[in-house]
């Protein structure tokens, strides 16, 4: 039963990864068309770095492209500002955990 569960988890992860690649390709096409208007091309933004000014510029992680995650921050003056950082969404963290676990088991 455990082997079946691991195999199903791996299949779900692989399907998620392949669909993510297709989505990332579409995002890349949109990003390239936007960047064509800019004179200089910026490098991608690493994990845990700020992406407030460039929400589509996050780097690619081990399996998935990082996503720009935003939150509203209230300063000491009571002013609300939006702060964003590149990170891995929870469902993708779970997929990476399953793949890592599968690699440890199957070599």
From Swiss-Prot:
PROSITE patterns with a match to the protein in the record: SPIDER_CSTX
Using the chain's own numbering, where are the disulfide bonds?
44-59, 51-68, 58-86, 70-84
The record's subcellular location field reads: Secreted
Superkingdom of the source species:
Eukaryota
Q: Disulfide bond: is it a keyword of this entry? A: yes
- Segment forming the signal sequence: 1-20
Tissue expression from the record: Expressed by the venom gland.
* GO-annotated cellular components: extracellular region
Alphabetically list the UniProt keywords. Disulfide bond, Knottin, Secreted, Signal, Toxin
Question: Which residue ranges traverse the bilayer?
Answer: none
**One Pfam family from the UniProt entry?**
Toxin_35
Task: Kindly report the protein's main subcellular placement as a broad class.
Answer: secreted
Propeptide per record: which residue ranges? 21-41
Q: Name one GO molecular function term.
A: toxin activity
What family is it from? Belongs to the neurotoxin 19 (CSTX) family. 04 (U1-Lctx) subfamily.
What's the entry's take on its domains?
The presence of a 'disulfide through disulfide knot' structurally defines this protein as a knottin.
Q: What's the protein name? A: U1-lycotoxin-Ls1p
Q: Which organism is it from?
A: Lycosa singoriensis
């Amino acid at each position: 039963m455990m082997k079946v569960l691991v195999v199903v988890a791996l299949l779900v992860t692989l399907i998620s990864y392949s669909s993510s690649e297709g989505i990332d390709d579409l995002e890349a096409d949109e990003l390239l068309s936007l960047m064509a208007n800019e004179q200089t091309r910026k490098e991608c933004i690493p994990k845990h770095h700020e992406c407030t000014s460039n929400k589509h510029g996050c780097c690619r992680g081990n399996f998935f492209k990082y996503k720009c995650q935003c939150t509203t921050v209230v300063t000491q003056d009571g002013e609300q500002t939006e702060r964003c950082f590149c990170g891995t969404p929870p469902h993708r963290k779970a997929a990476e955990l399953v793949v890592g676990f599968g690699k440890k088991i199957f070599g």
